[in-house]
UniProtKB/Swiss-Prot annotation:
Keywords: Cell wall, Cell wall biogenesis/degradation, Disulfide bond, Glycoprotein, Glycosidase, Hydrolase, Repeat, Secreted, Signal. It is found in: Secreted; Secreted, Cell wall. One of its GO terms (cellular component) is extracellular region. This is Exopolygalacturonase. It comes from Zea mays (Maize). One of its GO terms (biological process) is carbohydrate metabolic process. It comes from the Eukaryota.
Length: 410
């Protein structure tokens, strides 16, 4: 009986040893991918090389697959180094909350054949509670391909890849990172809700084509704060169907200013409403704060409840500009009145200098005039000597209080 007990005990210990040993081996396999508790995935442990030359796309995609498939809080670590990657597709929904910690630099491949038709560089789809943070760069390496941009010459041009695209992303955050030299737009949000963009830097030369800083469309609850943007197009552009946007503490320049639009180019565009821009500075921009809609627009929509306050202009051209006959690069063929209604727009405490005599231009149409415009303490003066500060107001109705007498439209 004792022999039988000893044999059973030995067999039990052997089985226990195998189980424990197997768990250790499995743990080793996990640790090869995870650099910390709760699922922290370092791309260098998945084969990424930070030499700026080796293609690390596969490693980054594998990190995403692991993080998105894990429960709880997951982190993808981009450590210091230069990581060359092609098109990245981060698709959800994810089982847990994912943070992408960008301490190093991601470099977009300049080989356009690696991007699918209408493809973007980093495309994030249907992911909630996503955080992209860190002090690293998302470098689109645009200078290598900007010469292939035909959008300044052709109305229906082939669009180069945008850098960071977020579609159907809710309750997300982008903070701390620098977006650099995108091939086209630096950041684009479509049908996103409750997004926070803070402490971000967006940089491209002032003459780089279509390098908008941050664009959004059909989105709501977007906050952009403490952000510095200098690009070759709009610093921030707010597209159709967007509402409840708060922009504060943004410095823009070079660039085309902070814009609503363009609007009316396509059918079935939706209204834009409840947009607040406050405590911002525009430095030597082509425009300051602007609303732009295509002449003879394809959609009937309304822009309303727009509030600009405490905006400082530093030698910006066209500081306040509403353009209902927008036609970029003179490539439009339409010659009719805009179907876009602009109403209830407030400009409060707008100060500084303009590099053009026209500090205010409200260019609305007789068929659909702009109404409810309020000019409250608008004091922007022409910085040149060959002309005087002036306002040009066509088919616009509203009120003026505390403004330079030269800027009294109403």
């Amino acid at each position: 009986m004792a022999c039988t007990d000893n044999a059973m005990r030995a067999l039990f210990l052997l089985v226990l040893f195998c189980i424990v040993h197997g768990e250790k081996e499995e743990s080793k396999g996990i640790d090869a991918k995870a650099s910390g508790p709760g699922g922290s995935f370092d791309i260098t442990k998945l084969g990424a090389s930070g030499n700026g030359k080796t293609d690390s796309t596969k490693a980054v995609q594998e990190a995403w697959a692991s993080a998105c498939g894990g429960t709880g809080k997951q982190t993808i670590l981009i450590p210091k180094g230069d990581f060359l990657v092609g098109q990245l597709n981060f698709t959800g929904p994810c089982k847990g909350d994912v943070t992408i910690q960008v301490d190093g630099n991601l470099l977009a491949t300049t080989d356009l054949s690696q991007y699918k038709e209408h493809g973007n560089w980093i495309e994030i789809l249907r992911v909630d509670n996503l955080v992209i943070t860190g002090k690293g760069n998302l470098d689109g390496q645009g200078p290598a391909v900007w010469s292939k941009n035909s959008c300044t010459k052709k109305y229906d041009c082939k669009i180069l890849p945008n850098s960071l695209v977020m579609d159907f992303v809710n309750n997300g955050e982008v903070s701390g990172v620098t977006l650099l030299n995108s091939k086209f737009f630096h950041m684009n949000m479509y049908q996103c809700k409750n997004m926070l963009i803070k402490d971000v830097t967006v940089t491209a030369p002032g003459d780089s084509p279509n390098t908008d800083g941050i664009h959004m469309g059909d989105s709501s609850g977007i906050t952009i704060t403490n952000t510095v943007i200098g690009v070759g197009d709009d610093c921030i552009s707010i597209g159709p169907g967007t509402s409840k946007v708060n922009i504060t503490g943004v410095t823009c320049g070079p660039g085309h200013g902070i814009s609503i639009g363009s609007l009316g180019r396509y059918k079935d565009e939706k209204d834009v409403t409840d947009i607040n821009v406050k405590d911002c500075t525009l430095k030597k921009t082509m425009f300051g704060v602007r609303i732009k809609a295509y002449e003879d627009a394809a959609s009937v929509l309304t822009v309303s409840k727009i509030h600009y306050e405490n905006i400082k202009m530093e030698d910006s051209a066209n500081p306040i500009f509403i353009d209902m006959k927008y036609c970029p690069n003179k490539l439009c063929t339409a010659n009719g009145a805009s179907k876009v209604t602009v109403k209830d727009v407030t400009f409060k405490n707008i100060t500084g200098t303009s590099s053009t005599p026209e500090a205010i231009s409200l260019l609305c149409t007789a068929k659909v005039p702009c109404t409810g415009a309020t000019m409250d303490d608008v004091n922007v003066e022409y910085s040149g000597t060959n002309n005087k500060t002036m306002a040009i107001c066509t088919n616009a109705k509203g009120s003026t209080k505390g403004c330079l007498k030269e800027l009294a439209c109403f």
